[in-house]
Amino acid sequence: MSVINCEEVKRDEFHTEKYYESYNIFGAHVVTEDEIQGVRFTVWAPHAKAMSVVGDFNEWDYEQHKMLQVTEEGIWSLFIPHIEEGEIYKYAIETLAGDVILKADPYAIYAEVRPNTASVVFDIKGYEWNDKNWTRKKKKKPIYKEAMTVYELHFGSWKKKEDGTLYSYREMVEELIPYVVEHQFTHIEIMPLVEHPYDRSWGYQGTGYYAATSRFGTPHDLMYFVDECHKYGIGVILDWVPGHFCKDAHGLYLFDGTPTYEYKDKDVQENPVWGTVNFDLGKREVRNFLISNALFWMRYFHIDGFRVDAVANMLYWNKEGQEQSNEHAVSFLRELNEAVFAEDEDFLMTAEDSTAWPLVTTPTYEGGLGFNYKWNMGWMNDVLKYMECAPEYRKHIHEKMTFSLLYAYSENFILPLSHDEVVHGKKSLLNKMPGDYWDKFAQLRLLYGYFFTHPGKKLLFMGGEFGQFDEWKDLEDLDWNLHDFEMHRYMHDYFKELIALYKRSKPLWQLDHSPEGFQWIDANNNEQSIFSFIRQGDKQEDALVVVCNFTKATYENYKVGVPDFEYYNEILNSDAEQYGGSGQVNKKRLKTILEPYHNQAAHVEITIPPFGVSILRPVKTRKGSKKQDGSKTKVRSNVTSRGKR
């Protein structure tokens, strides 16, 4: 990190212009000045009357190390000789009201382990990265036409030691990475790792945006974890919260005694539901703080993506009864995405947005917000409501399973089965399923089959892969003992086979963002709650037929219209006995019958299992058959697919 002497910085660079290396000015930097080694402290506090640095090195005496104000707009700085890395410190701020308050450093790179709240001097230089091969691989294969399976996890509750203590960043290399590799996830998405005081905020209410939480080790330890993930071909996505922050007294809130990082207007400052305050995204210094922070994580931790939290809350003012968009947030998000993609065009910027805001994943130069992915919250809500409904009544809400294809190509979507849906009394995915014990497992297998065959990249929260029975308990680890039970082992085996099938099957991801990648066979069989469709790859022969039965009935000799290939093989059946099913499978090769059905040139007759998904693959083209043309009924979109930037 190249530290810039703040006295040499033009005021406009931080206060009025785009300046995305703020971390080189602010914070605590181990430096040598006039041949004397020490630490330079720099902070922005525009309404402070006076500033000091306090810590163990001066017995927390406010009078000893007074800072110098170096710009009229409130940049303060001080070089303290002969102190070293590892010193704990805070800023003592004399407010306009004459009070002295203690604050952690907004740009601190390291902090004390909670419940202590001081910042820690840390020299971030020195880690030697070994991930050049990973970087080359990313550039060679952009994600838009590749398989993408994201494992979302909470670092502190995935697994704990026998005594209940947390695994460190370095220890998780041995615990987590082999597990992720075994399950063939392409990425992990970690809930926020910025410093935060309250465990149960899960990291979403941060105080130290530049500090990797010390709960799990040092910043260099986290770098090692990311480096090892890249070594084994795993991308690392971080949850990042640029919209709001917590009100703890040592943090950013009323930093110099006045609203500094947050809006001044109380009507838009507060988030009463979360107990947080909103960043003032119209203030240049705040934008520089946040965008510098994003680039800091990219440059120093080699992060591969951000899931940007609570975008909906940013896009709209939270004044009661007001639907007006927040133009500060809109322009900030565009500026953020432009800066990120200028740094790394292969980065993943995913919006967690539940609104119908248009063009979220359209580049800014085409009038969009500039993200390249968006969580498909509509799909998630509709599908889970459908699955929670008693099977005999699903025919009355049939449209919940078909509606998503009307807008599936309006954005680049990720399908999230996320932490939000398995907490706060919502039940686990397994326990959402109606019916008896067997029914629950059968329907979860069915849900996963539909999930992996529906257009869009995939995200699953930890525990779902083996059928966690209880909802997520953030103070405990996952119920790993469930592997002692046969049905959970079956579920785990099924999930691993399903994700392996997904990764080796181009039709399931190659045209995720193009209408040509999906075609309904029959979307209208609400009476039997059966859905059938085709997933298509770039080549004609890269096609799969998917049939999903959302009732407990078994159907034999069921006609399914198919493209004209001579034979089909069933390559996965969720009802197979090895997955805990009843064994209603199609073992034999299925010969097509050259009679049109479901607007297809031919059809096959299959057994459809109870609560089952059957995936069929064509074996060979019929001799003399013509290439499929565009006459088949396809899902159309009036929005151009944006599968690349």
Swiss-Prot record:
It holds the Pfam family Alpha-amylase. Keywords: Carbohydrate metabolism, Glycogen biosynthesis, Glycogen metabolism, Glycosyltransferase, Transferase. Pathway: Glycan biosynthesis; glycogen biosynthesis. It is an enzyme of class 2 (transferase). Residues 636-645 have a biased composition (Polar residues). GO terms for cellular component: cytosol. The active site is at residues 309, 352. InterPro entries: A-amylase/branching_C (IPR006048), Branching_enzy (IPR037439), GlgB (IPR006407), GlgB_N_E_set_prok (IPR044143), Glyco_hydro_13_cat_dom (IPR006047), Glyco_hydro_13_N (IPR004193), Glyco_hydro_b (IPR013780), Glycoside_hydrolase_SF (IPR017853). Catalyzes the formation of the alpha-1,6-glucosidic linkages in glycogen by scission of a 1,4-alpha-linked oligosaccharide from growing alpha-1,4-glucan chains and the subsequent attachment of the oligosaccharide to the alpha-1,6 position. Monomer. This is 1,4-alpha-glucan branching enzyme GlgB.
